[in-house]
Each structure stands twice: as structure tokens, then as C-alpha cells.
Amino acid sequence: MNELQEKRIYILDTNILINFSVWIPISLNKTFWDGLEEALKDDKWVLLDVVVDEIRYNPELEKWCGKQKRNGLVKKIEDHNRERAVEINNTYKMIDESNGNSTADTYIISYAEENKLSIFSRESFRIKENGLFKIPEVCQRLNIVTIKRPVKFLESISFKN
């Protein structure tokens, strides 16, 4: 891993936390989740309030995220991030107007852009040319680094199990 990659800080998309909780349940792997929490405390990755707010129907993960929020480890989206998110959505249509899906994606991108952060998401590029834009495609156009592979993220936070 090169020096730049080591210093890269990632914002996690909601799908990452959900997938981690499915494949590495909190109740069965305390070590993993404690390590993730320690890395969050050490500012090695970013957890946004809009991501936490999207966690539903997963009591264990909701509880874990609630703990991070109570400990002051969750970063808040500010009004200027919301304004930039609207601009991003106006340029690259991301939000499904019928149900509001992907609203957090524009906030994640806005926050990453402002703070020179990278994004860890399992999203792929859009399939249909006239479909909604996805995180990797918008980030590519805005020169924001994205990754999809958990191993890259775990290496970047120096995770040890």
C-alpha cells in the first residue's frame, strides 16, 4: 500500500454498514465491531448522521450506531452540505423522486468533496443511460476517490482482527 492510500479517509455508505452487519453480525463478532469503533474514534473513517438515519429494521446495527452518536463520533451534515447536495442532484440526477431513495448519497458526496475524503460504497455504475446516477459515477466526474472492496478499507484503517 502506498503512502497516499494509507492516509486516505473514507466515508462509509449505508450499504457498507448493513452488509458488514449481515456478514459479520455484531453479536457474533465483537472484535470486528470494536475495531471499527476504535478506528472511528481515531478519525480513520467517517460516519455521517444521514447514514445512521438510513439504518432501519436492523436493531443491532441501530444500537451500535446509536452508541457512536452518543459518543460524539457521528459527523453532522450542515446546511452548506445540503445546498451542495441539491446542486449535485440537479446536475447528476441521483434521488428517486417517487420515494426519496438515495437522498443520503448526495450528502455523502457533498461532504466528501468539501473535506477531501474518499467514499467506500458497494454501488456500481448505473445500468441504463437514462437511469439515476450512482455514487461511483458522480464521484468519478467530481474527482472523488471511491472503493468497493472491503479489504482496501480495512487496510486503510490498519484493521487487525
Question: Which positions does each model-derived feature cover?
Answer:
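Residue-level detector of structured alpha->beta connecting loops
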Residues: 44, 113-116, 143
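PIN-domain endoribonuclease scaffold, especially VapC-family toxins
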Residues: 49-99
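Active-site neighborhoods of divalent-metal-dependent phosphate/nucleic-acid chemistry enzymes
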Residues: 77-137
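Short, well-structured N-terminal submotif of metal-dependent ribonuclease cores
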Residues: 1-47, 54-67
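Structural alpha-beta junctions
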Residues: 38-42, 67-73, 140-147
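Acidic, PIN/NYN-like endoribonuclease modules and their adjacent C-terminal/linker elements
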Residues: 2-4, 21, 125-161
